[in-house]
């Protein structure tokens, strides 16, 4: 009652860094398949840590004790993943791990909501399990195509481009099946759109569209980022780039992501890296690392002034103090934290160089060694949170005010008074503040109807433009509370005619 993974039958032919072939032969000759499988998986993970450090950490001896037994038995999790999920579902479908992770958390989620009924608030440790919902593929495509895709199509449509360049619009639309064309606009609106787009990307100073930035501030396992990668690739290939060069630039310059869940962020990192590998067979050898991060806290770092003396410039010492202050209990708040714009990249450079200054001070060496990685993470997440992006697209966490911890409740009341009743609307307000062109989101439609959101609605209409909306009603997340998904343009265009679809008026199926 056992199955035999391919890695076992090919064990003696494997070439892995750190693989002890004598041990392989000994385990194989002794018919110790379980131990051999365990050894090969651990060795493979350690080898992968060199090229995928954000996903695979080196497994130490004590960690090996936690490795589960009996993985080769019929009915084990490994056997079920192989037997129950068709092989074709794994091919070019790296986002499948997001589905698996959501269901991995489902038991914990049930426990959290059972406790909530007893008035036990959701702690920061349980926020990921309680609030994560995997986004259906068609909604991901709708959001990305109508935000990131619209950045390109609107510019080609309204700026001064040759007829040859404008033919790319139809090429993109053939690929982007969920892209919704603009409604017919008045001459006055079209004139305003032309003025907005004129020389935005086609001035000749920068190659069009390649500096477009895209962030998912609640990225989960990276489903939205993975499809944004594909859309960016369509854009680059249309510009004449090779897929190899485009993959590297997309990861380095275009895609960004944040989440409070460490493990989900690892999966997002893995998904983006595997997407790069899909387009470039040598991608792992190029030393490129994506800008996707799990929000970290500063709680464990005790900072005394003398520890900061090796940062020679006062601005960097002040930035260190600020980082430790603003990210205290950061996993309680995640991407809704409002972070000052500072020279965080300059601070990072100074922080990396400061290691030499600690060599003559034993106390400082110990402190710096313990704080180094965390402070680096704090600076990177501060950099991402302090920027604006052409496109922000996300499926935010869902948690009503009644489930919030006292700290989180006080925070949103202070910083987000117009949207404080639910985390999804708080994230909506934050996302609009982060974008310069378009914001795409799926959330619950309470903000569309309840009187408590009247101020938000007035602000949205006065300062932004609704491009389009798809209102599916119930059923997107199973037996749920209803959803709406939409794209908002930054800045108000008076008289703009949006496009709206109600999918709940009759039973429909979206492919």
Question: Each predicted region: which residue ranges?
Answer:
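Catalytic palm active-site di-aspartate
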Residues: 220, 252-255, 443-444
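Short helix/strand-bridging catalytic loops that position acidic/His residues to coordinate divalent metals
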Residues: 124-130, 252-255, 410-417
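Class I S-adenosyl-L-methionine-dependent methyltransferase module
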Residues: 208-215, 224-387, 391
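Short, hydrophobic/amphipathic alpha-helical patches that form generic packing surfaces
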Residues: 1-2, 99-106, 270-277, 377
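Extended, well-ordered alpha-helical scaffold/bundle regions in very large, multi-domain proteins
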Residues: 2-46, 228
């Amino acid at each position: 009652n056992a199955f035999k993974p391919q890695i076992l039958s090919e064990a003696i032919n494997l070439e892995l860094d750190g693989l002890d072939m004598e041990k392989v032969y000994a385990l194989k000759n002794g018919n110790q398949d379980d131990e051999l499988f365990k050894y090969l998986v651990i060795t493979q993970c350690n080898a992968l840590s060199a090229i995928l450090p954000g996903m695979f950490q080196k497994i130490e001896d004590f960690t090996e004790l936690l490795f589960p037994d009996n993985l080769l038995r019929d009915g084990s999790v490994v056997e079920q993943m192989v037997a129950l999920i068709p092989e074709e579902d794994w091919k070019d479908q790296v986002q499948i791990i997001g589905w698996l992770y959501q269901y991995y958390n489902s038991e914990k989620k049930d426990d959290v909501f059972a406790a909530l009924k007893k008035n036990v608030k959701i702690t920061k440790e349980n926020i990921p399990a309680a609030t994560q919902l995997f986004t259906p593929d068609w909604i991901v495509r709708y959001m990305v195509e109508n935000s990131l895709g619209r950045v390109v199509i609107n510019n080609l449509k309204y700026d001064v481009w040759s007829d040859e360049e404008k033919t790319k619009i139809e090429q993109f639309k053939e690929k982007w099946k969920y892209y919704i064309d603009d409604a017919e606009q008045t001459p006055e609106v079209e004139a305003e759109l032309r003025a907005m787009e004129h020389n935005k990307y086609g001035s000749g100073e920068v190659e069009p569209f390649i500096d477009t930035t895209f962030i998912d501030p609640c990225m989960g396992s990276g489903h939205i980022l993975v499809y944004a990668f594909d859309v960016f690739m369509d854009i680059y290939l249309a510009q004449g780039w090779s897929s190899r060069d485009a993959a590297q630039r997309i990861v380095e310059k275009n895609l960004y992501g944040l989440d409070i869940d460490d493990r989900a962020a690892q999966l997002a990192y893995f998904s983006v890296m595997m997407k790069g590998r899909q387009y470039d067979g040598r991608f792992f050898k190029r030393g490129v690392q994506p800008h996707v991060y799990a929000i970290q806290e500063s709680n464990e770092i005790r900072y005394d002034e003398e520890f900061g003396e090796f940062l020679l410039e006062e601005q960097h010492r002040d930035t260190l103090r600020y980082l430790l202050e603003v990210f205290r209990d950061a996993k309680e708040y995640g991407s809704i934290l409002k972070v000052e714009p500072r020279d965080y990249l300059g601070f990072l450079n100074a922080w990396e160089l400061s290691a030499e200054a600690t060599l003559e001070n034993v106390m400082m060496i110990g402190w710096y060694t313990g704080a180094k990685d965390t402070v680096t993470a704090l600076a990177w997440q501060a950099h991402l949170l302090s920027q604006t992006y052409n496109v922000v697209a996300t499926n935010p966490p869902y948690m009503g005010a009644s489930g919030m911890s006292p700290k989180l409740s006080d925070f949103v009341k202070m910083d987000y008074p117009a949207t404080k009743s639910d985390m999804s609307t708080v994230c909506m307000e934050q996302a609009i503040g982060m974008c310069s062109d378009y914001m795409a989101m799926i959330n619950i439609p309470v903000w569309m109807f309840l009187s408590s959101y009247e101020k938000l609605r007035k602000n949205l209409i006065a300062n932004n433009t609704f491009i389009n909306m798809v209102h599916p009603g119930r059923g997107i997340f199973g037996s749920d509370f209803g959803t709406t998904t939409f794209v908002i343009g930054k800045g108000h265009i008076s008289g703009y005619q949006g496009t709206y679809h109600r999918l709940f008026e009759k039973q429909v199926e979206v492919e």
